[in-house]
C-alpha cells in the first residue's frame, strides 16, 4: 500500500470548495487526465453516491468511484477502483482558515498486477499528479467566479 498526501490553501469559502469537489462530475474541469465523469446513482450527493470516470491514462478502463464518508463541509471519504490497475481509498479534509479553505488529502493506493512493480514510482508520480490537480482546482476556483455557478 502506498500513501499519497498533501495540502493546499484555496481563497474561497470552505462550503464552496467542499461542494465543488464533492460533485465528482466537476473533476474534468480541473483534472486534465479525466476525460469525463458521470454520476450513476440518483439523489443528492452523500454516502453511497457512485460515479464512473473515464481517464486518459487507463485507456478503456473505467474508474469506479464511491463516496464512503460525507460530513459537509469538513470531510469527504471515497474509494476508487480501476480494474486490473489499482484501488485507491482516502479522504479530503476541509478547514476554514482566514481568507479561505485549507484542503488536505490522504490516499492509500494499492496497485494491482504489474503496477505493483512500480510502487515507489507510483508514490512519486501520484504526489506530483495530486499537486498538479489541486493547484489547477485552486486556480479555477480563485480566478473563475462562474466555476461555482454549476454547484
Model segments located where?
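Hydrophobic ligand-binding cavity/cleft-lining segments
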Residues: 1-41, 136-142, 149-151
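Hydrophobic alpha-helical core bundles mediating ligand binding, dimerization, or RNAP-core interactions
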Residues: 21, 31, 67, 107, ...
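Hydrophobic-ligand binding "helix-grip"
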Residues: 28, 44, 54-104, 108-113, ...
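A conserved amphipathic terminal alpha-helix motif
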Residues: 109-151
Amino acid at each position: 500500500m502506498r500513501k499519497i498526501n498533501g495540502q493546499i490553501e484555496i481563497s474561497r469559502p470552505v462550503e464552496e470548495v467542499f461542494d465543488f469537489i464533492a460533485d465528482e462530475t466537476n473533476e474534468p474541469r480541473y483534472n486534465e487526465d479525466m476525460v469525463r465523469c458521470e454520476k450513476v446513482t440518483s439523489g443528492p450527493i452523500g454516502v453511497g453516491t457512485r460515479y464512473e470516470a473515464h481517464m486518459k491514462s487507463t485507456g478503456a478502463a473505467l474508474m469506479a468511484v464511491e463516496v464512503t464518508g460525507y460530513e459537509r463541509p469538513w470531510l469527504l471519504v471515497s474509494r476508487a477502483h480501476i480494474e486490473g490497475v489499482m484501488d485507491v481509498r482516502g479522504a479530503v479534509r476541509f478547514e476554514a482558515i482566514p481568507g479561505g479553505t485549507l484542503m488536505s488529502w490522504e490516499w492509500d493506493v494499492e496497485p494491482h498486477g504489474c503496477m505493483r512493480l512500480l510502487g515507489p514510482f507510483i508514490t512519486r508520480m501520484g504526489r506530483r499528479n495530486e499537486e498538479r490537480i489541486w493547484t489547477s482546482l485552486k486556480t479555477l476556483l480563485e480566478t473563475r467566479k462562474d466555476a461555482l455557478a454549476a454547484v
